């Protein structure tokens, strides 16, 4: 079986998927929390495409009944104080399966130190 032409000769689909799976998922939001960008690892982790999540707040579709308010408290505090944090959360995949994820949240600012939004780095945990 040959690789699709866009992969090049040195890469196979399995190598690309392995690399995506190993990469942390990244989500970028504007200052109001709406998603403005994701990376391929985010789609791989949770099953959603950018078109499905654009403009939505991550909690609107990733959190559910087993997601505890306790685990979300550090995220809320960091957003309010415009600081960084790390926490572990139970999230929901598009197919509604539950997975545990470590989330690092960081504010991103322009050259004048004006808040532009947040970047979340997510790593799936066993």
Residue map of PLM features:
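PAS/PAS-like sensory domains across diverse signaling proteins
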Residues: 32-34, 44
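PAS-family sensory/regulatory domains
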Residues: 52-66
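PAS/Per-ARNT-Sim sensory domains
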Residues: 64-77
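Beta-strand residues that line the small-molecule/cofactor-binding core
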Residues: 84, 98-100, 117
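PAS-family sensory domains
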Residues: 90-96, 109-110
